[in-house]
């Protein structure tokens, strides 16, 4: 039996109006997520990773325009039947009240800015359950305490009454994960969830998300520039460059048999503890200015293997996995 596709992004195209002109930030994205799968979207800052997933949860800035595309979400309607909805066609109110948090939840990179400093931890976890699940307060409180224990926070009763500033960075990120899980979503989107944490805590948070994924049968999307995170958690990898996905494959094939020169460059820039080289490889040049639509391969100017045709024609998507 084939895996069920729970999220499908088709030909997504997004631009932003700026004082300098129109920035064509997302240029025809296609991406699939299967039930229970972990997919990573990896690329440099500004490649369009976060914008792609913010479109799915209705968090694009007001100057954004969705020019084309679909984001199809498939879920059980409660009667044993699959229902598919295009998230881009929903009103902001419908997306906020029926889907965000309840079916799709997002964990952001900086837990301090994700939490309300004026509200206790407990109230912030309960908020989603009261809004989406319409739970009685006593039941929501009990569930919030259970979630704190699930994400590895000891002395849950005490922490329930704490404010964000009273917790360490690692504990705050655990709270953010608890909030994301409070309405029992199908899909968890993690946007650089460990960037603001030290290396030891990073590993613990990644292990925690994996454990919760298996326990709650979640599908997870990681947005990251950290290939170490990708190697640890991902089943499949989508490599993004200049608003496009340029290579797709499972994690082993991407790491050991990369096809696109940009993917090769990213991997070459990773530190290797087995070599004595003091100098890290860096990809020459800078990403293109998307105020001006790139002609041909957007990576050609930075690619030492580029041919004449690369500056004239856009290459096809590199798919490593069959």
List where the protein language model places each region.
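A short, proline-enriched helix->beta-strand linker immediately N-terminal to the Walker B motif
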Residues: 182-186
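The feature captures the beta-strand-to-loop junction immediately N-terminal to the Walker
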Residues: 42-44
């Amino acid at each position: 039996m084939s895996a069920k596709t729970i999220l499908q992004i088709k030909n997504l195209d997004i631009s932003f109006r700026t004082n300098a002109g129109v920035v064509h930030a997302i240029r025809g994205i296609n991406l699939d997520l299967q039930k229970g799968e972990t997919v990573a979207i990896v690329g440099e800052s500004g490649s369009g990773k976060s914008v792609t997933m913010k479109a799915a949860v209705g968090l694009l800035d007001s100057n954004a325009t969705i020019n084309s595309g679909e984001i199809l979400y498939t879920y059980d309607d409660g009667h044993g039947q699959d229902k598919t909805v295009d998230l881009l066609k929903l009103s902001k109110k419908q997306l906020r009240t029926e889907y965000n948090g309840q079916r799709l939840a997002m964990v952001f990179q900086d837990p301090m800015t994700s939490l309300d400093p004026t509200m206790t931890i407990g109230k912030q976890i309960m908020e989603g359950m009261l809004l989406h699940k319409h739970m009685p307060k006593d039941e929501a409180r009990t569930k919030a305490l259970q979630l704190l224990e699930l994400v590895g926070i000891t002395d849950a009763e005490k922490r329930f009454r704490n404010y964000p500033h009273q917790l360490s960075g690692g504990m705050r990120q655990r709270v953010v994960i608890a909030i994301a899980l409070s309405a029992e979503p199908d899909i968890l989107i993690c946007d650089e969830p460990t960037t603001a944490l030290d290396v030891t805590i990073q590993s613990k948070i990644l292990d925690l998300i994996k454990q919760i994924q298996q326990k709650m049968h979640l599908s997870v999307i990681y947005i990251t520039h950290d290939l170490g995170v990708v190697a640890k958690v991902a089943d499949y990898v989508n490599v993004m460059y200049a608003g496009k996905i340029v290579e797709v494959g499972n994690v082993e094939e991407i790491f050991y048999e990369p096809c696109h020169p940009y993917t090769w460059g990213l991997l070459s820039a990773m530190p290797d503890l087995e070599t004595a080289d003091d100098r890290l490889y860096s990809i020459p040049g800078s990403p293109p200015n998307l105020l001006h639509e790139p002609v041909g391969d957007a990576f050609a100017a930075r690619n030492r293997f580029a041919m004449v045709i690369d500056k004239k024609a856009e290459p096809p998507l590199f798919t490593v996995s069959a």
